[in-house]
């Protein structure tokens, strides 16, 4: 015998009542969580915000202000207008350090990213020991720049001594020494980013390209690299900014020798501020110029690579 129709009606009402009760219970729980978040948000946000303002915003604003002053301490600052900026741009060593740094940033960008991408491709293939190799390649990134600089200085000078020369005697030996050092340190980090990008590519896309007759080289240029643009954007941005901001390795490996010809911008600013009495304001002006250059280059690079992402 078929069940009466009103049985289905009552069963439906019971199910609806059950679901409604759970819905309103869940809604009350969500509302209570939102109220708790709003109530305790200042407790978690304000200390972090205060630390950010005290540790970054306030010193940055103070530094910009001091770039227009002549001073030895903050209390005796005397406003001199754009005089410090004029001296900074007239400093031939500072101008040389800019071009030297720009060349280094471009060269390190190419070397680091080509090697990191090649390693990522190799280590995403099905082979034994990939996790061990990933760890080995990443480990140099954990060592401090100062320590690496002194270690590689001993290595390079030990080799160059056989040819009666040293890093401190030739700016281009120092330049390529820095390229090798920084590449050895950062390739592993960029490799991890590229591996994450490669693993995010859907396997169906690669299979479809292979079925369509694309060889490995065509799949690399037409499929892999276009779909890797987000990872490439991150790595190129990090490589360029790290290249311009390089300080520790430059200080410990070459210290700007010979005659400040291998001195990069960050080291030049440091030597101006702490090494030349009465030039503290000029050093601060150089720091502001340096900040503007790094931000501008970073924004241009991001815009260029982001446009590539959109096109792909």
Language model features: what each stretch is:
Residues 34-312:
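A structural signal for multi-pass alpha-helical bundles of membrane permease subunits
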């Amino acid at each position: 015998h078929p069940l009466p129709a009103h049985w289905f009606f009552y069963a439906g009402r019971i199910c609806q009542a059950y679901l409604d009760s759970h819905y309103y219970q869940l809604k009350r729980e969500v509302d209570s969580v939102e109220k708790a978040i709003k109530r305790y948000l200042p407790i978690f946000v304000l200390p972090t915000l205060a630390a950010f303002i005290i540790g970054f915003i306030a010193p940055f604003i103070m530094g910009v202000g001091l770039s227009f002053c002549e001073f030895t301490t903050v209390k005796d600052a005397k406003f001199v207008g754009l005089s410090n900026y004029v001296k900074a741009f007239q400093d031939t060593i500072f101008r040389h350090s800019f071009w030297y740094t720009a060349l280094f940033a471009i060269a390190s960008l190419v070397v680091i990213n080509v090697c990191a991408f090649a390693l990522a491709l190799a280590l995403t293939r099905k082979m034994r020991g990939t996790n061990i190799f990933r760890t080995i390649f990443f480990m140099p990134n954990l060592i401090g720049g100062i320590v690496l600089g002194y270690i590689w200085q001993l290595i390079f000078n030990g080799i160059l001594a056989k040819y009666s020369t040293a890093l401190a005697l030739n700016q281009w030996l120092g330049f390529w020494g820095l390229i090798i050092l920084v590449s050895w340190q950062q390739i592993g980090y960029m490799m991890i980013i590229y591996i994450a990008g490669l693993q995010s590519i859907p396997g169906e896309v690669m299979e479809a390209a292979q079925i369509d007759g694309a060889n490995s080289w065509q799949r690399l240029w037409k499929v892999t690299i276009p779909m890797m643009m987000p990872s490439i954007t991150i790595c190129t941005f990090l490589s360029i900014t790290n290249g311009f901001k390089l300080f520790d390795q430059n200080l410990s490996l070459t210290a700007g020798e010979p005659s400040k010809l291998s001195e990069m911008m960050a080291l030049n600013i440091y030597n101006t501020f702490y090494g030349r009495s009465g030039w503290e304001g000029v050093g601060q002006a150089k720091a502001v110029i340096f900040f503007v250059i790094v931000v501008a280059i970073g924004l241009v690079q991001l815009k260029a690579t982001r446009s590539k992402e959109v096109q792909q």
